[in-house]
Design a protein with these regions (language model features):
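A transmembrane helix-and-boundary motif of multi-pass membrane transporters/channels
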Residues: 1-76
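Short, charge-rich amphipathic alpha-helical segments embedded
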Residues: 78-92
Length: 268
């Protein structure tokens, strides 16, 4: 019989084994690629489902003027950031895997579209945190009219439904389904954008007006998430009328502070 001599276990041998193993792994990934869209789709759906629940809780908080629910909605809104970061991370990984795949054209467009949608959703999440913080403060310190409570609640409910549609628009398996849900969210937001005017919504306090303004920002973010340009999204917003509160600041009076002076001057 033949006795084989043991292979010396030196650094070169281990490096060679690693190179060979990596080459075979790369070849297997290239020839039999896994669908890179699976994880980002699931993450996007989970993110938007959680976002929809935040809007729904906010809707209940302002409708029933419940500070505890408003504060909880703020905490839940803050908890969206880790979900977004995980979704964004999976998307970046998926795009990298897709570049190494021989049939990358199949997934490239969908992943690029998802990246644009997530960028707009990120802005909406940030604006929603501000909205919920202001809403909790408003409920704690100011009593809004019943009409204002109901109209704000209805708007938040619409955002909740739109968030669910956006989630389906990113996670549905076919292009036709994704387009359907994106258009559904867009049409809902365009309709809502035409109603977000303080006077129309029964708002008569400065605090209530600030909530309406924040809603307008989130609606624009969601319209951009469906693929609309920023210019087109802003264009469908109902124009704002004059301030309805007596104590609202005049936007034409801008205080300018000179660094070398103690007093400030107001320029009209």
């Amino acid at each position: 019989f033949t006795l084989l001599l043991p292979v010396p276990d030196d650094a070169f041998t281990r490096s060679f084994d690693g190179i060979v193993g990596g080459a075979f792994a790369f070849l297997a990934m290239y020839l039999m690629p896994r669908d890179p869209r699976k994880n980002p789709r699931a993450r996007a759906q989970a993110l938007m489902d959680a976002f929809a629940k935040v809007f729904q809780l906010s809707s209940e908080a302002i409708r029933y003027y419940d500070y505890n629910k408003a504060y909880q909605s703020l905490l839940d809104a803050r908890a969206l950031q880790p979900l977004y970061d995980a979704c964004r991370g999976d998307l970046i990984t998926a795009q990298g895997m897709n570049e190494l795949s021989w049939n990358s054209r199949k997934s490239k467009g969908e992943l690029a579209r998802m990246a644009k949608t997530l960028a707009a959703v990120d802005l909406a999440i940030r604006n929603d945190r501000v909205l919920n913080r202001r809403m909790a403060s408003t409920i704690h310190h100011v009593q809004l009219r019943t009409a204002a409570q109901l109209s704000l609640s209805d708007a938040l409910t619409e955002l909740s439904v739109a968030a669910q549609s956006l989630g389906l628009g990113m996670s549905a398996p076919t292009e036709g389904e994704r387009e359907h849900y994106m258009m559904e969210a867009r049409e809902r937001m365009i309709k809502l954008a035409g109603t977000l005017e303080p006077r129309t919504m029964g708002v008569a306090t400065f605090e209530g007006e600030s909530l309406v303004l924040m809603l307008r920002l989130i609606v624009v973010d969601f319209m951009e998430a469906t693929g609309m340009s920023h210019k087109d999204a802003v264009a469908v917003l109902v124009p704002l009328g004059e301030a309805v509160t007596k104590h609202a600041p005049r936007t034409s009076a801008i205080p300018i502070v000179d660094a070398d002076m103690d007093d400030s001057t107001v320029v009209d």
